[in-house]
Amino acid sequence: EDIRWPVGGEIDILENRGRISNISSSALHFGKQWNKKSTLVGEALIPREVRFQDKFHSISLVWKENYIAFYLDNSLDPYFTINSDHPEFQKYKYPFNRDYYMILNVAVGGKYDDYWVDFDAFCSDRACSNKENPDSHRFIIDWIEYERL
């Protein structure tokens, strides 16, 4: 099936900004072409006293016909839900009722976050390098589980 982006839609299960450690987000992208599209974002707010990066977390995606929900860890309440009745799907067709491929894009940085660059966050000394201790600064995916309901 030759469906181009963003017509076919994109589901981002997890997106984070390194400089904002108390927000984890998920996003849906869809539309007619790259400059005529919508992006819907849901954010899970983590209390500031909790260091989100100090332990593994589970991001769950419940994906049913005309409905998508995202959950953080063991919460019974989703932090982001969308269904095909959302007003943005009046402008652009709801594309999420079809099969998808899973792609793990584990990029860090880039032009996400409104092109904002925190130059103070660049690693320029041994204190922020992980050369001597690779475990100190990594993005680790422990496991992925797929279950068809």
Labelled PLM ranges:
Residues 1-149:
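GH16 jelly-roll
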